Amino acid sequence: MAVDTAQTPESNSIDTSADNVLEVRNLKKHFYVGGGFLARNSAMTIQAVDDVTFSVKRGETFGLVGESGCGKTTLGQTIIRLYNPTAGNIIFNGADISSLKANDLRNHRRKMQMIFQDPSASLDPRMTVGSIIAEPLNIYGIGSREERQERVRELLRVVGLNSYFTNRYPHEFSGGQRQRIGIARSLALNPDLVICDEPVSALDVSIQAQVLNLLRQLQQDFDLTYLFIAHNLAVVAHISDRVGVMYLGKLVEIGEAKTITEQPKHPYTQALISAIPVADPGRQRDRIILEGDVPSPANPPSGCRFHPRCPVARADCSEQEPLLREVTPGHWVACHYAE
């Protein structure tokens, strides 16, 4: 059951402005894994998302970045309620949807949609493109059959595809075209918030920029708000207004995209930035190599979860967990020694 923990220290990092489309307060998503009949005592808890707090303003793009397994996709799926939260609050358009039942959640969910990572897996191969895009309209009973068909043709044109593609099947399209179909489907109900889960990572580099530019144009045309999830910080910084950096289920840094890329404060963010190639051949960037593997979310380290891999960790980092604190206006860092 979701609980209200809005008064905990890290909740100070959230902007509770009326302009927020989304507020996430101390959100947790834990998975309980049993040991089976022969290992009943080996049950464990996977702390996929652990005490995450942030807000997203109307019309902005908030980027979530981190290594694979950090919990960013689980966070997005919990926000849209594909998973039920273990604890915490999800405030969408001013309403707490954390513990709503299916019938009550229905009207809120139509205003938040998701673009999935792999268009080959997220589009039903047995359905035509027209049926795929029209499915949300059918579920909510919007418009007549003719109006739905016209809406589908309009959405295809909006994402840069020909309107006569409605009777074709997903396998007849390239990866970039299939992702455009997925984007069209996400727009069918005129959402306020679109959660973009690694929307370009499965595409060729030559196609990624086209899809990113399309998302930007659609945001301007339809007043969309994006939660943009990716493992590539360069991509996230390119499209986002603000960025949150996740590590092992927790947010370790939040700030304006330019601030995060030019003045990163958390050692983990600094390591991610150092891996981004520099376009200027006359300029070099010192690469920060992190040693060791990411610890298991079933047994996270004590204190700061990053301390086993941190190049500047000290003794107290393994004992006391750092909370997000504001080091400069709008720039929050969970590190004892960030300045």
Model-derived features with residue positions:
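Short catalytic/signature loops enriched in Gly
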Residues: 4, 13-20, 33-40, 45, ...
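A short, proline-enriched helix->beta-strand linker immediately N-terminal to the Walker B motif
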Residues: 188-192
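ABC ATPase NBD coupling module
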Residues: 38-43, 84, 97-113, 139, ...
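Conserved ABC ATPase "signature" region
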Residues: 95-96, 147-164, 270-274
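P-loop NTP-binding/switch modules centered on Walker-like glycine-rich loops
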Residues: 195, 199-203, 207-285
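Conserved ABC ATPase signature
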Residues: 169-173, 177
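Conserved ABC transporter NBD signature motif
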Residues: 88-96
